[in-house]
Amino acid sequence: MTAIAVAAVPLAFPAAAWAAPTDTDVPWTTYQASLDPITANHVTGSGTAMIQLSGNTAKITVTASGLVGGGSPHAMHIHVDGAGVCPKPSEAKDHNGHSSINVADAMKDYGMIGTSLTTSGDSTPKSALAVDRFPAGSSVKYSRTLEVTDNVAANLKSGKAVLVVHGIDYNGNGKYDNVLGASELDKTLPAEATDPALCGAFNVSQMTSMPGGGADTGDGATQTGSGIHTGMVAGGSAAAMVGLGIGGFALRRRGVTTR
């Protein structure tokens, strides 16, 4: 597996308001990102992300659509320590005879993984490829409260934090396959499964409300729409394989840690 450094690795929101939280004495700051498609990867989806941050507590909401469906998992991360921008189409390189952008190509732009937006359990960079604990399907509606590191909080405050949703359908056949070859992150995965699909840099927002439904107040996450359910995954070690029936590939279950 090609090593990648890990830190220390928008649809308009509905008008319904959710009042700023009052469960801490530390002021809350709202950050918002418009998630735009990585067009070099033949993506047409869009989305929005919002974070309310108080100290190291982050109430995170992501809404997206136009992604690969059929239960395909979409890893989502807050990237840090880069330039705080998303890759341009001109940065595409040749991958298996096709012009596209993979994770490594864009790392200088959005940086390394700081937080993995898993639906449960561990949310550190160790869970970067924990495919059974990421949202799945063509649309995502994600909400979770997490504790982020000092470095992730600092990157949000400095405008260097970027949200990236991964997983593309470059050849338009509705599933992940090897049209772009193997992923540079894990040779057992197709590149389509890990290449960036949507990207957006976080900026301080003037909004003082969360999307309709709001962020939850516990550690768990909510996600609506089609997707993979943890009941489909057999328990086991970090090497346990998750058969997803997409393009004949089995996606590796990584870094599964529950709290």
Question: Which residue stretches match the model-derived regions?
Answer:
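N-terminal leader/targeting pre-sequences
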Residues: 1-257
